[in-house]
């Protein structure tokens, strides 16, 4: 799947509107929009990293991003959602009124909605690189090849997490 490139933001800051709570050690890239409509809120816990141009728009409830979660560039979260501890959302992932469990991983360009069950790939760490995993509709993401390596790399790059 081809994903269009993200344009660099005009501003080197992020924008927050409404009831938005951000922990002191959160890393937020330029061009991020955090919008909480009336009677809604956004909570971002310690150690979260939000990538360039992401949009988090709370409507009709809360969006809660738990400690250590990583949102890559261009992520869109709309409605009500919980992103679990140490979850990783791939670039240009869209969540609409749905949540990701702790440690969950989404592929770049994923679209997850409360109306349709997520489709995730189940891959064991013993599979050789280059094989395409079979997709199956399941309720929660499962083990993803390379997750342990990613977590070690993130720990070495960001030791305070």
From Swiss-Prot:
Disruption phenotype: Cells with a disrupted or mutated protein do not have carboxysomes, instead have less dense inclusions, do not grow in normal air. Targeted disruption do not grow normally in air but have wild-type growth in 3% CO(2), called a high-CO(2) requiring phenotype, HCR. Cells have a single polar aggregate instead of carboxysomes; RuBisCO localizes to polar spots consistent with the polar aggregates. A motif (Encapsulation peptide) lies at residues 144-161. Induction: Carboxysome size and components vary with growth conditions. When grown in ambient air at medium light (50 uE meter(-2) second(-1)) there are 74 units of this protein per carboxysome, the numbers decrease under low light and high CO(2), and increase under high light (at protein level). SUPFAM superfamilies: Trimeric LpxA-like enzymes (SSF51161). Residues 111-140 are annotated as: Disordered. The keyword Glycosyltransferase does not apply. Its main location: other. It comes from the Bacteria. InterPro entries: Trimer_LpxA-like_sf. Keywords: Bacterial microcompartment, Carbon dioxide fixation, Carboxysome, Photosynthesis. GO terms for cellular component: carboxysome. GO terms for biological process: carbon fixation; photosynthesis. Residues 116-137 have a biased composition (Polar residues). Changing residue 146 to D: In hcrO221, requires high CO2 levels for growth. One of its GO terms (molecular function) is structural constituent of carboxysome shell. It is found in: Carboxysome. Belongs to the CcmN family. Required for carboxysome formation; the N-terminus interacts with CcmM which itself binds RuBisCO (ribulose bisphosphate carboxylase, rbcL-rbcS), while the C-terminal 18 residues interact with carboxysome shell protein CcmK2. Required for growth in normal air. Beta-carboxysome assembly initiates when soluble RuBisCO is condensed into a liquid matrix in a pre-carboxysome by the RbcS-like domains of probably both CcmM58 and CcmM35. CcmN interacts with the N-terminus of CcmM58, and then recruits the CcmK2 major shell protein via CcmN's encapsulation peptide. Shell formation requires CcmK proteins and CcmO. CcmL caps the otherwise elongated carboxysome. Once fully encapsulated carboxysomes are formed, they migrate within the cell probably via interactions with the cytoskeleton. The N-terminus interacts with CcmM, while the 18 C-terminal residues (encapsulation peptide) are required for interaction with the hexameric shell proteins (CcmK2) and are predicted to form a helix. The 2 regions are separated by a linker. Interacts with CcmM via the N-terminus of CcmN. Interacts with CcmK2 via the 18 C-terminal residues. This is Carboxysome assembly protein CcmN. It comes from Synechococcus elongatus (strain ATCC 33912 / PCC 7942 / FACHB-805). The lineage of its organism: Bacteria, Bacillati, Cyanobacteriota, Cyanophyceae, Synechococcales. The gene is ccmN.
